[in-house]
Every structure is written in structure tokens, then in C-alpha cells.
């Protein structure tokens, strides 16, 4: 049981390191907060919450993995190497792909609600 709990401690330490050291991780957290606030305001459904939660976790997980790749590349070489650049670029690309997917999900869920708010000046739950 101790090693199981120790694993959680290590995981939280890793997340804390990413948040402290990576500006983009903090940007993702701000957007996650905005999505949660919008979800509460627009009263998204339970399935929509599940989709939003999965989407946010995918983006943040990609950021964590990108940080791990960058750390390992930096550890492996201190001079420029095109293979190191390719690894770092691929990690950044993975984050970009998940972030673009998250934007698409956000538009699908919040787009009609935001449009109704802009057009009518108010938002009412239409069900």
C-alpha cells in the first residue's frame, strides 16, 4: 500500500514540476478554468462534462509528456542535434494537435450557446 501511495506522490510531484516550470502548462490551466466556468454558466449536460473533462485531461497530459520528452532530450545532449530538435518538435506538435482538438470540442459544445447569447443578449436553456 505504501508503494501505491508513493506512486501518487511522485505523480503529483511531476505535475507540480510541469506547472512550475512550463508557461504553456499554466496557460492550459487558465483555459481549463475558463472552460469550467463556461460549463457552469451554460449548464452543460453530464455527457458534455465528460467530453470536456476528457478533452482537458488529454491536452494537459500531452503537455506533461512534452515536458518529459524535452527534459530527456536536454539531459541527453547539450549541443544542437537535428534528432533532438525533431524529438522536441514532435512533442510540441502533439500538444498542438490535442489543443486544436480541444478547440473543436469547445466550439461544438459552446458555439451554439455563445451564438444564442450574442444574438439574443441572453442565454436560456433550450431543451
Model-identified regions with their sequence ranges:
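Hydrophobic alpha-helical transmembrane segments
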Residues: 2-68, 76, 80, 95-127
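Basic, amphipathic juxtamembrane/active-site segments
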Residues: 74-90
Amino acid at each position: 500500500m505504501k508503494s501505491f501511495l508513493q506512486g501518487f506522490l511522485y505523480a503529483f510531484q511531476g505535475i507540480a514540476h510541469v506547472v512550475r516550470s512550463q508557461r504553456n502548462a499554466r496557460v492550459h490551466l487558465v483555459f481549463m478554468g475558463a472552460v469550467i466556468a463556461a460549463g457552469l454558466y451554460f449548464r452543460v449536460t453530464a455527457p458534455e462534462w465528460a467530453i470536456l473533462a476528457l478533452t482537458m485531461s488529454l491536452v494537459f497530459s500531452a503537455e506533461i509528456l512534452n515536458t518529459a520528452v524535452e527534459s530527456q532530450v536536454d539531459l541527453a545532449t547539450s549541443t544542437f542535434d537535428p534528432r533532438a530538435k525533431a524529438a522536441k518538435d514532435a512533442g510540441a506538435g502533439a500538444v498542438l494537435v490535442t489543443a486544436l482538438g480541444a478547440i473543436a470540442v469547445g466550439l461544438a459544445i459552446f458555439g451554439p450557446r455563445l451564438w444564442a447569447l450574442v444574438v439574443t443578449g441572453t442565454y436560456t436553456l433550450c431543451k
